């Protein structure tokens, strides 16, 4: 068999049966979903409004806060329980009176509804969260909880079965 035909066939088979099967993932081993979200450098928004993961899937989520002369804002990213966006955002605005809220707590409000969060990132910083997606399907909001940002700087992590 011609070597080119062999590699083309191997590529086609790999595409049909799915990622990880021919290239090292053990059967039953979950595939890691890698997502990068960047804070928009001139507006209060993320470049990603929605992403989808499987329930119980391993996730590597990277938040990038780019550095340039336009972006001087710190940002973070919280993943929270469905239906709690306004509650968490309002709590973040209210907790600004606490001097430790920005410095020690990275603008993360005290709440059991916060599932995962990054630290507060200055321009030019990034952070990667590694976690297992919730086991229950649903729309899990993510937001920047720096005071005043949450109402426009949010999106949805869709968890599917």
Task: Please give the residue ranges for each predicted region.
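Bacterial N-terminal signal peptides that target proteins for export
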Residues: 1-9
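Extracellular/periplasmic metallocenter environments
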Residues: 64, 69, 105, 112-161
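Short Gly/aromatic-enriched secondary-structure transition segments
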Residues: 73-81
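Short beta-strand elements of extracellular/lumenal beta-sandwich folds
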Residues: 57-65
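N-terminal edge beta-strand
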Residues: 30-58
């Amino acid at each position: 068999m011609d070597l080119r035909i062999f590699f083309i066939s191997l590529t086609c088979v790999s595409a049909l049966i799915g990622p990880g099967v021919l290239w090292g993932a053990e059967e039953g081993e979950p595939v890691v979903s890698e997502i990068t979200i960047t804070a928009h450098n001139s507006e209060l928004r993320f470049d990603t409004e929605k992403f989808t993961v499987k329930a119980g899937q391993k996730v590597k989520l990277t938040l990038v806060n780019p550095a340039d002369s336009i972006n001087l804002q710190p940002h973070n990213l919280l993943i929270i329980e469905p239906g709690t966006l306004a509650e968490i955002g309002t709590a973040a605005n209210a907790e600004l009176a606490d001097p430790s809220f920005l410095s020690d707590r990275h603008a993360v409000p005290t709440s059991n509804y916060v599932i995962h969060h990054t630290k507060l990132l200055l321009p030019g910083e990034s952070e990667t969260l590694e976690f297992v997606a919730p086991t229950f399907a649903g729309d899990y909001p993510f937001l920047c909880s720096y005071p005043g940002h949450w109402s426009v700087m949010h999106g949805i992590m869709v968890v599917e079965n």
